Amino acid sequence: MAYNRRSKHITQGVARSPNRSMYYALGYQKDDFDKPMVGIANGHSTITPCNSGLQRLSDAAVAAVKAADANPQIFGTPTISDGMSMGTEGMKYSLVSREVIADCIETCVQGQWMDGVVVVGGCDKNMPGGMIALARLNVPGIYVYGGTIRPGNWKGRDLTIVSSFEAVGEFTAGRMSQEDFEGVERNACPTSGSCGGMYTANTMSSSFEALGMSLLYSSTMANPDQEKVDSAAESARVLVEAVKRDLKPRDIITKESIENAVSVIMATGGSTNAVLHYLAIAHAAEVDWTIEDFERIRKRVPVICDLKPSGKYVATDLHRAGGIPQVLKILLDAGLLHGDCMTITGRTIADELKDVPSVPRADQDVIFPIDRALYKEGHLAILKGNLAEDGAVAKITGLKNPVITGPARVFDDEQSAMDAILGDRIRAGDILVLRYLGPKGGPGMPEMLAPTSAIIGKGLGESVGFITDGRFSGGTWGMVVGHVAPEAFVGGTIALVQEGDSITIDAHRLLLQLNVDDAELARRRAAWQQPAPRYTRGVLAKFAALARPANQGAVTG
């Protein structure tokens, strides 16, 4: 039986003789035209360590596709480095790159009638971009995560890239020596691989195991390790089998499997960006999913992993402790996982977990049983109030001050806020408001890791609030509220905040409130004028014109 269900449209018949001529130039033989064409969407790049180790994974996938009697077709996908672009205009391209990656993969797979696709990616937006494409295409596909970086070390202290961001604030506050500042800088990132805590890349890749679109154990492997290469090869082999069975992403990505994915995100203390990305993935898969669904999952799934940024350990520690399968098995046994959901292997998630022990190993303190959960409820909360009528996203577990009321310190751009923080003009009790940074206003919802890390480095992480219509890095922790909707650019209440206004952030009541009376707000609203777009041409202008609100995933199509 031939499995070239799609590629036959480009390789078969008299009219396709010119096509075959071009394939012969690529080294194809006559019998290859009856084999499935499998795309390898290769995100390798020397822009960032997150993607610098992907070529060997792509090569392994290519070899495995050939060994499975299919034709690999390699094409590139772009990336930017969130970590390097952080705090610059380049960060505005981060979320935009999610859409560009999805569009690139869709374009190549559809334009070439590929029968399946292996997506290989590393940096933060590679994961949602690839999964959005797979959900849109509904062509057999699998995600191969590039793997995590190993932790750095300086004077016996484990480091991640966030250590370097926080060192900026510590150094400028006089709390760190020049030697230690440079030591952290040089040693925070010792290998290839994505940022090591349960930040955005590891959050999304971990959730893909639960979603059923990546192989178990694959998300917590370190990029330099041979097992990561072996996993890439096995992923490609599994994908060819999925092509033969015609097992498609929408057979796997359902409301129930998204609930599984979000449950793992809650259990592991994952990134706020996952809220935005799963709204977009669900939209691409035509699954009914809203921000209220995150709140529903949060209330029933506890945090059972002690992982950075708010915890102690990194992804390699999680891997040694049993990885995501151990987390999944604990959730399954507790009735917090849909065990009947299909995975890319053709087996259910329950079948995949049958050999995983029900109790985590006693010689580790990364993963905890349900009855010893770190927090009884999840950490990613949806806050609402007159400052975020359509919702905002916050991490609320582990806060020493879960309720804060203070004066607004208002900034219409990130650099002004950084100058105020590093210039010691922010005080305990202040609430920073960074606005005009939403999907349309930024545009692109840039992440605010630089200012939040600087605040932490200054020793104000537990005493200063932070509100934005932009995003936060997966490495952010503290009293931070992002994704405020409606955003300032479209006239959301955040645009009406004035310097010194009283604001309340209440993690108990899930409240984000501007303490200004309705009459005054009405007066301000009548006087407000929408600013001119920051960009009038290029990809940022396109994104600003097309992007939906943050509470709808900031999708463009």
UniProtKB/Swiss-Prot annotation:
Cofactor(s), names only, from the UniProt record: [2Fe-2S] cluster; Mg(2+)
PROSITE patterns tied to this protein: ILVD_EDD_1, ILVD_EDD_2
Cofactor: how and how many bound: Binds 1 [2Fe-2S] cluster per subunit. This cluster acts as a Lewis acid cofactor.
Record keywords: 2Fe-2S, Amino-acid biosynthesis, Branched-chain amino acid biosynthesis, Iron, Iron-sulfur, Lyase, Magnesium, Metal-binding
Catalytic activity: (2R)-2,3-dihydroxy-3-methylbutanoate = 3-methyl-2-oxobutanoate + H2O; (2R,3R)-2,3-dihydroxy-3-methylpentanoate = (S)-3-methyl-2-oxopentanoate + H2O
InterPro entries, A to Z: DHAD_IlvD/Edd, Dihydro-acid_dehy_C, DihydroxyA_deHydtase, DiOHA_6PGluconate_deHydtase_CS, ILV_EDD_C, ILV_EDD_N, IlvD/EDD_N
EC number(s) recorded for this UniProt protein: 4.2.1.9
Organism superkingdom: Bacteria
S-S bonds: none
Alphabetical list of Pfam families matching this protein: ILV_EDD_C (PF24877), ILVD_EDD_N (PF00920)
Entry-linked Gene3D superfamilies: IlvD/EDD C-terminal domain-like (3.50.30.80)
Pathway where this protein functions: Amino-acid biosynthesis; L-isoleucine biosynthesis; L-isoleucine from 2-oxobutanoate: step 3/4; Amino-acid biosynthesis; L-valine biosynthesis; L-valine from pyruvate: step 3/4
Residues annotated to bind [2Fe-2S] cluster: 50, 123, 195
Modified residues (N6-carboxylysine): 125
Annotated Mg(2+) binding sites: 82, 124-125, 447
Family to which the UniProt record says this protein belongs: Belongs to the IlvD/Edd family.
HAMAP family: IlvD
Subunit structure: Homodimer.
Functional note: Functions in the biosynthesis of branched-chain amino acids. Catalyzes the dehydration of (2R,3R)-2,3-dihydroxy-3-methylpentanoate (2,3-dihydroxy-3-methylvalerate) into 2-oxo-3-methylpentanoate (2-oxo-3-methylvalerate) and of (2R)-2,3-dihydroxy-3-methylbutanoate (2,3-dihydroxyisovalerate) into 2-oxo-3-methylbutanoate (2-oxoisovalerate), the penultimate precursor to L-isoleucine and L-valine, respectively.
NCBIfam families tied to this protein: ilvD (TIGR00110), PRK00911.1 (NF002068)
Protein name according to UniProt: Dihydroxy-acid dehydratase 2
Organism (species): Burkholderia lata (strain ATCC 17760 / DSM 23089 / LMG 22485 / NCIMB 9086 / R18194 / 383)
